[in-house]
Curated annotation (Swiss-Prot):
Residues 10-272 form the Helicase ATP-binding domain. This is ATP-dependent DNA helicase YoaA. Changing T620I: Partially complements the AZT sensitivity of the knockout mutant. The gene is yoaA. Changing K51A: Cannot complement the AZT sensitivity of the knockout mutant, decreased colony size in presence of AZT, not toxic upon overexpression. Loss of ATPase and 5'-3' helicase activity. Pfam families: DEAD, DEAD_2, Helicase_C_2. It comes from Escherichia coli (strain K12). It catalyses: Couples ATP hydrolysis with the unwinding of duplex DNA at the replication fork by translocating in the 5'-3' direction. This creates two antiparallel DNA single strands (ssDNA). The leading ssDNA polymer is the template for DNA polymerase III holoenzyme which synthesizes a continuous strand; ATP + H2O = ADP + phosphate + H(+). DNA-dependent ATPase and 5'-3' DNA helicase. Has single-stranded (ss)DNA-dependent ATPase activity and 5'-3' helicase activity on forked DNA; both activities were measure in a YoaA:HolC (chi) complex. Requires a 20-35 nucleotide (nt) 5'-ssDNA tail; dsDNA with a 20 nt gap is also unwound. Unwinds damaged 3' nascent ends (such as those terminated by 3' azidothymidine (AZT), 3' dideoxy-C or an abasic site on the translocating strand), to promote repair and AZT excision. Without HolC the protein has much lower activity which could be due to YoaA instability or helicase stimulation by HolC. Binds 1 [4Fe-4S] cluster. One of its GO terms (biological process) is DNA repair. Induction: Transcription is induced by AZT and repressed by LexA; has an immediate rise after AZT treatment and a slower response that peaks in the late log phase of growth. The late response is not entirely under control of lexA. Interacts with the DNA polymerase III subunit Chi (holC), probably as a 1:1 complex. Its cofactor is [4Fe-4S] cluster; Mg(2+).
Length: 636
């Protein structure tokens, strides 16, 4: 490999401010060798290694077909619009590059047209968004909905004007030649480097979604960034699920077919109404939102059983009625195919005694999902890798537990892979301090949020905000935010009150804010400099013991003679904590304090595993020392 990473290499010459880093060069060498030998490679690269450039440069130099997959759409967009162009330009790369997302990320012109025709039946706000989207549809080049600023990202119009694998009419669609998904796929087929995300990669490999399936067999190199998310995402795709959103979409499409093309078939409207009603009734039976529970236990309840049977019957009715009008409307024909698919899925979900699977359900305020997930995806993922010879490269800042990658590789069935553990080049002994508070209030006791907020207030105020408070539950997040707002004058931002992107923008522009958040801010958030110099974590992030997926994995581990705590719960929590901690120091000049409000870190034997997996920062139990550390001005 020409040494692109040397002080006088291509990257240093072409990229302003590029500083050579030894761990980055080591990773680039390992990636180059893995590509040349066509063998798997697993790399944990600590924050600040510069892992993106370390895999991009060798991948572009290899002149092979490359798929790069990310855990989040945010990183996918950043790679495609920022990192890839920068490295391509530096290396004078002349190949074609494409971005490909799942089809629900693109505007569907046919569904937009159908909604505009059904306009009078839509609520006013949705109708006004549909009108805005019609005007946007004439301006957009790629139809990527993340680039539309005129309609809010949580607008209820989006599911109506985007397609899913289930409701797409495919080549029968009157808008097929202008279809944004088809254009994006064609571009990806012709490209040398394609940027996708894990959801799309796995959906394609498992479901063989038409079109994209032809793209992957040709790839010589598969690179997974944020690879720590792969095992959980893979388990979703190797299982099956059915959601109320899918059923309500089906009912809507049957209604549109009746109102536009099949006005003589009133039965269609009746069966669509009954399906929508039974889906909503079933959601009401499930109770509180935000809960993930055991489907086997749920279906033992006679009341739920009755609602489930009713759902099954109305789906059956839609299938029978749609069958009578086959061949008269492309929209209804597609709806019939979905009804067939959903009947099969519902049947699988009813057979709750299949061993080797976890059966679970989840509900939000308006919707529910019923799902079955395999307990282990190792064999299936191993099979997948065997079918696709080439280099499989997995990287993330958080793959190891106590300097061991086995937890990650065993979950994906990765064998005989080269592995590399690269520590962060940051000087944590100078840049950071870890504080585990003394005299913490008893968790889950009434008033614990009030006491904790009172303990934390002095350090947050001494730091003039500039703080992330990361919580392990929504309830704690809301309670703490309420306490902070009642007792502090600093701006307190709360996750969920606006979109993630806007919250981050508000946090950065305020310059003295406290952001109280939960899971989605634990990873993939990059705030550099003095804007963020304090990260507080309310407790060690063990997954709730009631979570059916966790329970099932623990049971599977027990049956194999393992220790569920040591092999499942502890490693999962360590990886999550490492992600949260990684929010603090993002640059060589950053300084900050990490506060963990959980005595178990120092009182329980397993605390040592957590500490051994964290960056080597000095530790204290004295909050006054943490306040003094924050008072020292940074070297910026």
């Amino acid at each position: 490999m020409t040494d692109d990473f040397a002080p006088d290499g291509q990257l240093a010459k072409a990229i302003p401010g590029f500083k050579p880093r030894e761990p980055q060069r080591q990773m680039a060498v390992a990636v180059t060798q893995a590509i040349e030998k066509g063998q798997p490679l697993v790399v944990e690269a600590g924050t600040g290694t510069g892992k993106t450039y370390a895999y991009l440069a060798p991948a572009l130099r290899a002149k092979k077909k490359v798929i790069i997959s990310t855990g989040s759409k945010a990183l996918q967009d950043q790679l495609y619009s920022r990192d890839l162009p920068t490295v391509s330009k530096a290396l004078k790369y002349t190949g074609n590059v494409a971005l490909l997302k799942g089809r629900s990320n693109y505007l569907c012109l046919e569904r937009l047209e159908q909604q505009a025709l059904a306009g009078g039946d839509l609520p006013v706000q949705i109708l006004s968004d549909v009108i805005l989207l019609r005007s946007w549809s004439n301006q957009t080049v790629d139809g990527d909905i993340s680039t539309c600023v005129s309609v809010a990202e949580d607008s209820q119009a989006w599911p109506l004007v985007t397609s899913t694998n289930d409701n797409c009419l495919g080549s029968d669609c009157p808008m097929y030649k202008d279809c944004f998904v088809v254009k994006a796929r064609k571009k990806a087929m012709d490209a040398d480097v394609v940027v996708v995300n894990h959801h799309l990669f796995l959906a394609d490999m498992v479901v063989k979604e038409s079109g994209f399936g032809e793209l992957i067999p040709e790839a010589d190199v598969m690179i997974f960034d944020e690879a720590h998310q792969l095992p959980d995402i893979a388990s979703q795709y190797f299982g099956q699920s059915l959601s109320s959103r899918q059923l309500l979409d089906l009912a809507k499409d049957i209604t549109i077919a009746y109102r536009t093309e099949l006005k003589d078939t009133q039965q269609l409207q009746k069966c669509a109404d009954r399906l929508a009603q039974s889906a909503q009734d079933f959601r009401l039976q499930l109770g509180e939102p935000g809960y993930r529970g055991n489907l086997r236990e749920l279906l033992a309840n006679p009341q739920i059983q009755r609602a489930f049977l009713l759902l099954d019957d109305t789906l059956e009715l839609c299938y029978d009625v749609a069958k009578l009008s086959l061949g008269r409307s492309a929209l209804l024909d597609a709806a019939f195919e979905r009804a067939t698919l959903y009947r099969t899925r519902l049947k699988r979900l009813k057979e709750i005694n299949q061993p080797g699977y976890s059966y679970w359900y989840e509900c939000t305020s308006r919707h529910f999902t019923l799902a079955l997930t395999p307990l282990s995806v190792a064999d299936k993922f191993k099979e997948l890798m065997a079918q696709k010879p080439g280099s499989w490269i997995f990287t993330s800042a958080t793959l190891s537990v106590n300097d061991d990658l086995h937890h990650f590789t065993s979950r994906l069935g990765i064998e005989q892979a080269e592995s590399l553990l690269l520590p962060s080049p940051f000087d944590y002994s100078r840049q950071a301090l870890l504080c585990v508070l003394r005299n913490l209030p008893q968790t889950n006791q009434p008033g614990s949020a009030r006491q904790l907020a009172a303990m934390l207030r002095p350090i947050i105020e001494a730091n003039n905000g500039r703080c992330f408070m990361l919580c392990t539950s929504h309830a704690m997040m809301r309670d703490l935010a309420e306490q902070f707002r009642a007792t502090m004058t600093l701006p307190v931002l709360l996750q969920g009150e606006t979109s993630k992107g806007q919250l981050l923008q508000q946090f950065v522009s305020a310059g003295n804010a406290l952001l109280v958040a939960t899971s989605s801010f634990w990873e993939g958030v990059d705030v550099r400099g003095d804007t963020l110099s304090l990260v507080i974590i309310d407790k060690l992030p063990f997954t709730s013991p009631d979570d059916p997926l966790l329970k099932a994995r623990m049971e599977d581990c027990r049956l194999r003679g393992g220790d569920p705590f040591d092999e499942v719960q502890l490693p999962d929590a360590v990886i999550t904590l490492k992600q949260g901690v990684g929010r603090l120091i993002r640059d060589a000049d950053d300084r900050g304090v990490l506060v963990i409000c959980d005595n178990r870190l120092v009182m329980r034997p397993y605390g040592a595993t957590f500490l051994a997996s964290l960056p080597p920062a000095p530790r204290t139990r004295d909050i006054a020392r943490a306040v003094r550390f924050l008072a020292i001005p940074s070297s910026r």
